UniProtKB/Swiss-Prot annotation:
Pathway: Cofactor biosynthesis; coenzyme A biosynthesis. One of its GO terms (molecular function) is GTP binding. GTP binds at D35, I36, V37, D54, K56, E109, D132. It catalyses: 3'-dephospho-CoA + GTP = GDP + CoA + H(+). The keyword Transferase applies. This is GTP-dependent dephospho-CoA kinase. Its EC number is 2.7.1.237. One of its GO terms (biological process) is coenzyme A biosynthetic process. Keywords: Coenzyme A biosynthesis, GTP-binding, Kinase, Nucleotide-binding, Transferase. Belongs to the GTP-dependent DPCK family. It holds the Pfam family DUF359. InterPro entries: GTP-dep_dephospho-CoA_kin.
């Protein structure tokens, strides 16, 4: 399990890319991280390769996603952490050609975007919500992977 160190909290609150008020047109594989961004994508007829969510927004407000996923995988991931179970699931899902898969998180999903960037192929788009601002859209590239690798090295392994 990786634990977020206190000194990284502020850095990770800032968006890693451009923030959009509405979903831009995207041509490529998409991974959504977060309930509202997943719900928004699906409501706009965008079916992500992988959707990661916990059915809550703002830590405790229930969210309903009206969609039938091809497969739902459940993982535990405590707040402020990245569980080994979540890492292994994302690593596996990055290698398969399937789409419309849900990773339903018992806990908190926010930090899992880091693991998606680490393992998913270059060219994949990662979308996550930026509270009160909009949707952050990242296209995975070598530079972003290196930046995320440096951040993950600062996590505490327990």
């Amino acid at each position: 399990m990786l634990v977020l160190p206190e000194e990284l909290r502020e850095k990770l609150k800032k968006p890693f890319g451009k923030v959009y008020k509405t979903l831009p047109d995207i041509d490529g594989d998409i991974v959504t991280v977060g309930d509202i961004v997943t719900k928004t994508a699906i409501e706009n007829n965008i079916i992500p390769k992988l959707s990661i969510f916990d059915l809550k927004t703002r830590r405790n407000i229930p969210v309903k996603i009206n969609h039938v996923f091809k497969k739902v995988i459940k993982v535990k991931n405590p707040p402020g952490c990245i569980s080994d179970e979540a890492i292994e699931s994302i690593k596996y899902l990055s290698t398969i050609n399937d789409r419309n898969i849900a990773l339903l998180v018992d806990g908190e999903e926010d930090l899992l975007a880091l693991i998606v960037i680490k393992y998913f192929p270059i060219g994949t788009y990662v979308l996550y919500g930026q509270p009160d601002e909009g949707i952050v859209v990242l296209k995975i590239n070598k530079k972003l992977k290196q930046e995320i690798e440096e951040i993950l090295k600062q996590f505490k392994k327990i």
